Amino acid sequence: MAKQATGTYSRITRHAATLLGKQIRIARKGRKMTTQDLSDRAGISRGLLQRIEKGNLKCQIGAVFEVATIVGLKLFDADESSMIARIKQADDKIALLPKHIHPSKKIVDDDF
């Protein structure tokens, strides 16, 4: 399986990952947690935590979200009950969408 190079991500994506990593580091230090404490609590390696805090885009999103939650960062600006309600709303919308998207066929006008 080919690995995606960081250079293929948009600038805003790279900035968002960097910002989230810095916010995680600030929250961790604010709670007086070492990288070892947080990585143990999240069930990840110290190296992975360090990559998350640097904004590495190759980190698993589940690990990033878990670390952010442990240090108290609020994800999606919602509490758990409203997040569950928003998931239900998204499921309802997805149910109304077509299961498959077929590209529209271009009709070539070759009548000169």
Where are these regions (language model features)?
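A short, Lys/Arg-rich alpha-helix, primarily the initiator
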Residues: 2-29
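Residue-level signal for the short linker/turn that defines the boundary of a DNA-recognition helix
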Residues: 22, 32-33, 59
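Generic structural marker for isolated residues within well-ordered, non-membrane alpha-helices
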Residues: 24, 35, 64
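Short polybasic/polar patches that bind polyanions
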Residues: 29, 40, 69
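Short alpha-helical DNA-recognition segment
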Residues: 32-48
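DNA major-groove recognition helix of helix-turn-helix/homeodomain DNA-binding modules
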Residues: 60-78
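Short, charged recognition helix plus adjacent turn
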Residues: 78-112
